[in-house]
UniProtKB/Swiss-Prot annotation:
Produces no obvious effect on ionic currents when tested on the mouse dorsal rooted ganglia (DRG). InterPro entries: Conotoxin (IPR004214). It comes from the Eukaryota. This is Conotoxin MaIr94. The presence of a 'disulfide through disulfide knot' structurally defines this protein as a knottin. The cysteine framework is VI/VII (C-C-CC-C-C). It comes from Conus marmoreus (Marble cone).
Amino acid sequence: MKLTCVLIITVLFLTACQLTAAGNSRDKQEDPVVRSSGEVQRSEDIKLAKRCLESGSLCFAGYGHSSCCSGACLDYGGLGVGACR
């Protein structure tokens, strides 16, 4: 009986801690990144910055998005591999 009471109290305590932590952290990112038109506007971390391929670089076409700076990847022969315009 004592063990059951201890387990119930422990579960209630841990649940209360989780709910409190979740409520306090809502809408409070430490370093929010604002993305607009596919580009990172504020990023101190170089890994988060968007990199694009220059004209003439090899790219993968046909995926609905392009990693080319111009936004256009010209597909050669329908293979899905092309070059940035």
